[in-house]
């Protein structure tokens, strides 16, 4: 007869511990796989068309943001990714709380695209003047906003930079903006469309959208680079 192997109490306890560790590891991996993309802890929203600066950078380079060719192909996005990648991963979190409707006080000149250097400076690179990629639009266009959290809106304000302003060399100031649309309330949803009619604009401009959310005093400040055809 073969030698009979004796299983001790210590062996049994070790087996149970190993199995428990394996189960916990598998559960942890499953939970990590369910988390959203890196850096985005809370869903909010942004203008997706014409794409905001950081949304456009995430859209074009989010799957390959370490590609060195970006430095030549898309230099403004390159400097933004180098400054703080979380500004792109969190493309839907560019807001300030408690502005009380006094936006120039909360967001000084030269800091409009970062929402007054909100979120500890995460979005500061978006204030840089330069040749940001543009979206071609006509004099009549639609601003499309994605509100993942369905906050709703008390109102939207849509501005276009004055003719003659050069976003490739000039920091954006409130005095550079011309109001082209003001809306009423929007019920909570995930997708909003804001029709805009303009005249007299040509070439490169910034469309600046202010979104006053309804769920609290939370305001989004969003720069989209466009080319009027």
Give short role names for the model-derived ranges.
Residues 42-151, 155-171:
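N-terminal "mature-chain" segments and other terminal, solvent-exposed stretches
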Residues 170-197:
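Extracellular carbohydrate recognition and processing domains
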Residues 161, 201-216:
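Internal, hydrophobic beta-strand segments that form the core of beta-sheet-rich folds
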Residues 149, 164-165, 198-203, 229:
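A short, structured loop/turn motif at beta-sheet edges
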Residues 18-30:
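Sec-dependent N-terminal signal peptides
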Residues 31-40:
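C-terminal segment of classical bacterial N-terminal signal peptides
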Residues 1-17:
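N-terminal secretory signal peptides that target proteins for export/translocation
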Residues 217-229:
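Short beta-strand elements
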């Amino acid at each position: 007869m073969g030698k009979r192997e004796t299983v001790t109490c210590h062996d049994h306890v070790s087996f149970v511990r190993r199995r428990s560790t394996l189960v916990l590891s598998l559960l942890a991996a499953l939970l990590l796989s369910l988390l959203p993309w890196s850096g985005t802890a809370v869903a909010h929203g942004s203008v997706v068309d014409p794409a905001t600066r950081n949304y456009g950078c995430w859209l074009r380079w989010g799957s390959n943001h370490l590609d060195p060719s970006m430095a030549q192909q898309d230099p403004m996005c390159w400097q933004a990714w180098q400054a703080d990648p979380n500004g792109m991963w969190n493309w839907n979190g560019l807001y300030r709380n408690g502005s009380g409707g006094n936006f120039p006080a909360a967001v000084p000149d030269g800091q409009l695209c970062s929402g007054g250097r909100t979120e500890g400076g995460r979005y500061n690179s978006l204030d840089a003047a330069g040749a940001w990629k543009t979206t071609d639009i006509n004099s009549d266009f639609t601003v499309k906003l994605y509100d993942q959290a369905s906050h709703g809106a008390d109102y939207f304000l849509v501005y276009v930079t004055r003719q003659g302003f050069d976003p490739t060399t000039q920091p954006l100031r409130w005095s550079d903006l011309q109001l082209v649309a003001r809306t009423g309330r929007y019920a909570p949803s995930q997708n909003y469309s804001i029709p805009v009619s303009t005249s007299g604009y040509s070439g490169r401009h910034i469309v600046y959208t202010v979104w006053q959310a309804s769920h609290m005093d939370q305001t989004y400040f969003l720069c989209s680079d466009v080319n009027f055809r």
